[in-house]
A protein has these predicted regions:
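Short aromatic-glycine-enriched beta-strand elements
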Residues: 13-25, 613-617
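Conserved lysine of the Walker
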Residues: 347
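Conserved helicase motor core of SF1/SF2 NTP-dependent helicases
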Residues: 333, 353, 357, 361-364, ...
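Pre-P-loop entry segment of helicase/translocase ATPase cores
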Residues: 152, 213, 221-222, 266-326
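C-terminal accessory regions
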Residues: 604-717
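Conserved helicase motor core of P-loop NTPases
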Residues: 450-598
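Structural detector for short beta-strands of small beta-barrel domains
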Residues: 1-15, 52, 608
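Accessory alpha-helical DNA-binding modules that contact the DNA backbone or grooves
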Residues: 20-28, 35, 43-51, 58-273, ...
């Protein structure tokens, strides 16, 4: 392994997660060396030592592949001044640094080299807050250096040093040595095998409780992403055996001990033992219990329903079908009911009627909500009644996980009626959180299209509620929205029936552009986007929807190409490059993490209207926000988004890339969901074979959940 010393001349690239960087190092021989590393980029001007080896990149030539980086302690007074200034401490500028150097003289080099930050507290003339921050920063630099050496000695990338220090502080190395698997809790991108190898180096054997515990936690953490609330015990043992390659009896005994301690929960159903993480068990069991309590009550409102329906029809120049009338009557009569149907079946018109009817019936405290901001806005426009997102309604607890809300059973919502739209997006944890906050006196109406993609997260609540046959529901089948020749709706229903849509027909609403290569696809997408952009007033009314995020045909790369084509650099446009991504005034962006302080949530799309020295200013549907540039990891470019991210939204124009390289993502419900996002126009850019594959592929991924069975009373809690 080679070691090179020098200073960072320029940072070229750093990814969003700050786990990969490219920078130019100027060594002590005045040679400029391109370095790459899987760690947070060092700051420009810092003296560092990188360790690694030279490699030959097929495109960029000779580079230094660094496995670790260490900030060097200064060896002269000029370097000491630069070192202290580069610490980036607020209120600790050039004058303050001069005070430190004047007070310590040459001794500052020894203090920094031997990591004795406690002596900093003796300096006169500096504010206590600055001295405390300087002490903590220098202490942290020493610990980071120790962590870097620790990781390097075990042949592990030092990219995780900073996140470990943030969590464990001065005890970082001691914590890891005691239990290296704690790394998996604080370093989300670390593989289990990395921590496992470190544990082996530290003498932890294969059946050690710490290893079994970490393996189990690793498996259970993946359940939510896979849609499961639980796993059959045999599958859980099998997965752990595959991961740990240890004695199966040890695994079984360990699971049994956790069940006895209450650290895991279980349920028997049809002679199979299902194992739950605690939060999933509570969400499933309590979510069902809240539902049952409402189902046991029937509380019809004081309203002449037939007369109300007739008057609503006259006032709005419409005629309800039998199923629509049934849905309205059921919602007024039952405390808990469902309405499901595809596009154009009148779900939103029914919601509008329900709002009016409940108001006339004396139940005026009505809430309309949906999982996403765009869905809530659409609901507001269609019903002329203010709707909100579920997250805003429940008021998230800042600093906690995504399902911890201030509104709950102890502090319920002050409502008479709640109508939840786009309910196909409800996973079991969000459903539980919502039901816990609904008072027992309220009417609950759940509305959604059960044929869309299942939710992100565990369970498929809407489907389970319908399939249980325990919940009063209405299924809408008759199409009303522009029923005369609406090819978007016709194509969506054809896809849902497993039939090919007409890809050869000439239609303003639904069209197909065949392509034979990736380059052709990208050119067609850009050409169509530019053309359709001229027909809309709102940039948010056109959307590219891709089956997946990563890869050459993924939404991330498509967004980059479209940005260059429709919003190129210009001297009058502000722009900023953060973590390797360029953001420019006029760009569409999507929020990818909940920001409770700014009240902007995952999935919301906006447009950048200004960029300042410190902030990216974004106009979202419901508000304008100033996002600090150092928090830009919370957004991504959004010219293209995934189908999952598009759920709950509608756009005037939808462009759908659909090519064979999407592989296993070519599924019927995915294509159906993408097509039904469009109000006026759908353009599919791809191949006939990809569409054919999706139409005939029914997503058969099994989700392990006993929500339906609990509702039916067929399994014990």
């Amino acid at each position: 392994m080679d070691a090179i010393r020098g200073f960072v001349y320029r940072t070229i690239y750093e990814n969003t997660q700050r786990t990969y960087c490219v920078f130019i190092l100027k060594d002590y021989n005045e040679e400029y060396i391109t370095c790459t590393g899987k760690f947070e980029s060092p700051k420009e001007g810092e003296d560092i030592e990188v360790r690694g080896r030279y490699v030959e990149h097929e495109k960029y030539g000779r580079q230094f592949d660094a496995s670790s980086v260490e900030k060097l302690k200064p060896d002269n007074m000029g370097a000491a001044k630069t070192y202290l200034l580069n610490l980036g401490i607020k209120g600790f500028g050039e004058k303050s640094v001069e005070k430190v150097l004047e007070y310590f003289g040459i001794r500052i080099l020894e203090i920094l080299r031997e990591e004795r930050p406690e002596e900093i507290k003796d300096i006169p003339g500096l504010r206590k807050s600055v001295k405390d921050e300087l002490f903590n920063t220098l202490l942290g630099e020493g610990i980071l250096s120790d962590l870097n050496h620790f990781f390097e000695s075990h042949h592990i990338s030092s990219k995780w040093s900073r996140i470990v220090y943030i969590y464990y502080g001065v005890q970082s190395v001691a914590v890891i040595e005691d239990n290296p698997y704690t790394l998996l809790r604080v370093a989300p991108d670390m593989l289990f095998g990395t921590a496992d190898t470190l544990a082996e180096h530290l003498g932890i054997n294969g059946s050690d409780t710490r290893r079994l515990e970490a393996g189990l936690e690793w498996i259970l953490r993946s359940l939510d992403n896979q849609g499961h609330t639980c796993l059959p015990v045999d599958q859980l043992i099998g997965r752990l055996d595959d991961l740990l390659q240890t004695d199966v009896d040890d695994i079984a005994n360990f699971i049994e001990s956790l069940l006895e301690q209450g650290a895991l929960y279980s349920t028997y159903y049809e002679d199979i033992l299902y194992i739950y993480p605690p939060e999933m068990y509570v969400s499933e069991v309590e979510g069902v219990q809240y539902t049952r309590e409402l189902l046991l009550q029937a509380d019809p409102i004081s309203l002449d329903i037939p007369s109300f329906i007739e008057k609503f029809e006259r006032d709005n120049y419409i005629t309800f079908g039998d199923a629509q009338k049934e849905a309205i009557q059921l919602s007024f009569f039952e405390k808990f009911s469902l309405i499901t149907g595809g596009p154009g079946t009148g779900k939103t018109t029914i919601i509008k009627a329900l709002v009016k009817g409940f108001q006339l019936g004396g139940l005026g405290r009505i809430i309309l909500c949906a999982p996403t901001g765009r869905a809530a806005k659409r609901l507001t426009e269609a019903t002329e009644f203010e709707a909100t997102t579920i997250h805003r309604l429940l008021v998230p607890v800042q600093g906690s996980d995504s399902y911890d809300f201030t509104k709950n059973e102890d502090d319920p919502l002050d409502i008479d009626v709640i109508i939840i739209d786009e309910a196909s997006m409800l996973n079991v944890r969000l459903f539980y959180s919502l039901m816990a906050a609904i008072p027992k006196e309220a009417h609950v109406i759940i509305v959604g299209d059960v044929d869309q993609l299942p939710p992100i997260g565990a369970g498929f609540v809407l489907k389970d509620l319908l399939d249980s046959d325990c919940v009063p529901y209405t299924r809408l089948n008759q199409i009303y929205r522009q029923s005369s020749g609406n090819t978007i709706v016709e194509s969506a229903y054809a896809i849902n029936r497993g039939e090919m849509p007409n890809l050869e027909g000439v239609s303003e609403e639904f069209s197909f552009i065949p392509v034979k290569s990736y380059d052709m696809m990208m050119k067609a997408i850009i050409d169509v986007y530019k053309r359709e952009q001229e027909t809309i007033e709102d940039e948010l009314d056109i959307q590219i929807i891709s089956p997946m995020r990563r890869g050459e045909a993924g939404s991330t790369l498509i967004s980059q190409y479209v940005q260059q084509a429709v919003n190129p650099p210009d001297s009058y446009k502000g722009e900023v490059r953060v973590n390797g991504i360029t953001y420019r005034v006029g760009d569409k962006v999507i929020q990818i993490l909940n920001d409770y302080e700014l009240e902007v949530f995952n999935g919301e799309i906006g447009v950048i209207y200004a960029i300042t020295r410190t902030d990216i200013c974004i106009r979202f549907i419901h508000k304008e926000v100033r996002l600090p540039i150092d928090e830009a990891h919370m957004i991504m470019p959004a010219y293209a988004i995934t189908v999952h991210k598009s759920q709950g939204s509608e756009y005037g124009v939808v462009i759908i890339p659909f090519v064979p390289r999407y592989g296993g993502m070519l599924q019927r419900n995915l294509l159906y969901t993408a097509v039904t996002r469009a109000k006026r126009k759908v353009i599919i850019v791809g191949t006939t074979s990809a569409v054919e594959r999706a139409v005939r592929t029914v997503n058969a991924d099994e989700r392990y959940t006993l929500f339906k069975e609990r509702l039916q009373g067929r399994c014990d809690s």
